[in-house]
UniProtKB/Swiss-Prot annotation:
Residues 44-250 are extracellular. The keyword Zinc-finger applies. The chain crosses the membrane at residues 23-43, 251-271. It is a multi-pass membrane protein. This is RING finger protein 215. The gene is RNF215. A zinc finger (RING-type) spans 325-366. It comes from Homo sapiens (Human). Pfam families: zf-RING_2 (PF13639). The lineage of its organism: Eukaryota, Metazoa, Chordata, Craniata, Vertebrata. Residues 1-22, 272-377 are cytoplasmic.
Length: 377
């Protein structure tokens, strides 16, 4: 009664695989932990919506003509609704400081020019010392409102220090085009000419930026708060600031590279830890299997064996009632080695030893040769 198929070795069950490391679950949160936006992100966590709502911006070109001088070409952005047409604007340029000093209404068809230099920046810091992030350069805003009151067809802003003046409250000022000029040497030349009261005229047209190295970003921050001096209309806060995109681009690339390397290192460490844990568990399991096999071999070596001794009469044709090996179903022959189990059943030694290495039980009565008990299987 040999088995149809030998089952696998009865060894201790393998330990369950180690659970996934918590670091693997935290890897998707690594960019958030390190700062997904990288350098230049908003301090309050709010996300800017560039060119949103009524604070849209488009690139403009300003051609300035001065007497007995070469024409100046300036670049900037126009603040206004994206749906509004961009008609050709032109007229005489007048500096608001001079207009305020003369206390006279300029002629029709003129363009107001307001600027913020070092003196205005120092005054702005002095006036807004200790104030919150919603403090605005009030003098500049008052100049802009006075220009609209006097009938200026457009507002031209010369902000020489973009790092100082970032936020302008221009509530109710979008009835006229507001143009912020990029800083360049031509802006300085224009400002010097206007301070000398040189008569200058300008034409403002929409167009693409002429310089690839200068970028301006108009950002609409809805979290900056409402205007303190608004007239009850649209009172969101337009934050004007040079984005310096080309300057921040290498820094952003460096930040992305550092973030990528950090994620790769963390992933490599997690994978290495998982492999070490897997190898350790395999070594432990292999050691347990080897120990179990050595125990079975020692037990088999301690079992009794004997040589089969048959009478001369039995050495001829086998008797139908003669004993057989329950493993190979063959008769016991003279001088064969037999294995005698503790349950007194005998088998061919070469047949039953491989069975005992796999099952450790008697093929007939299921007696466990290791534990000296009968198996319930």
């Amino acid at each position: 009664m040999g088995p149809a198929a030998r089952p696998a070795l009865r060894s201790p069950p393998p330990p369950p695989p180690p659970p996934p490391s918590p670091l693997l679950l935290l890897l998707p949160l690594l960019p958030l932990w390190l700062g997904l936006a990288g350098p230049g992100a908003a301090a309050d966590g709010s996300e800017p919506a560039a060119g949103a709502g009524r604070g849209g911006a488009r690139a403009v070109r300003v051609d300035v003509r001065l007497p007995r001088q070469d024409a100046l070409v300036l670049e900037g952005v126009r603040i206004g609704s994206e749906a509004d047409p961009a008609p050709l604007l032109g007229g005489r340029l007048l500096l608001m400081d001079i207009v305020d000093a003369e206390q006279e209404a300029p002629v029709e068809g003129w363009i107001a020019v307001a600027y913020v230099g070092k003196e205005q920046a120092a005054q702005f810091h002095q006036e807004n010392k200790g104030s919150g992030p919603q403090a605005y350069p009030k003098a500049l805003v008052q100049q802009m409102r006075r220009a609209l009151f006097l009938g200026a067809s457009a507002l031209l802003l010369l902000i020489l220090n973009h790092n100082v003046v970032r936020e302008l409250d221009i509530s109710q000022l979008l009835l006229r085009p507001v143009i912020v000029l990029h800083y360049s040497s031509n802006v300085t030349k224009l400002l010097d000419a206007l301070l000398q009261r040189t008569q200058a005229t300008a034409e403002i047209t929409s167009g693409e930026s002429l310089s690839a190295n200068i970028e301006w970003k108009l950002t609409l921050w809805t979290t900056c708060g409402l205007s303190k001096d608004g007239y009850g209309g649209w009172q969101d806060l337009v934050c004007l600031g040079g984005s310096r995109a080309q300057e921040q681009k290498p820094l952003q690339q460096l930040w992305n590279a550092i973030l990528l390397v950090a994620m790769l290192l963390c992933t490599g460490l997690v994978v290495q830890a998982q492999r070490q844990a897997s190898r350790q568990s395999q070594r432990e399991l292999g050691g347990q299997v080897d120990l179990f096999k050595r125990r079975v071999v020692r037990r088999l070596a301690s079992l009794k064996t004997r040589r089969c001794r048959l009478s001369r009469a039995a050495q001829g044709l086998p008797d139908p009632g003669a004993e057989t090996c329950a493993v190979c179903l063959d008769y016991f022959c003279n001088k064969q080695w037999l294995r005698v189990l503790p349950c007194k059943h005998e088998f061919h030694r070469d047949c039953v030893d491989p069975w005992l290495m796999l099952q450790q039980t008697c093929p007939l009565c299921k007696f466990n040769v290791l534990g000296n008990r009968y198996s319930d299987d």
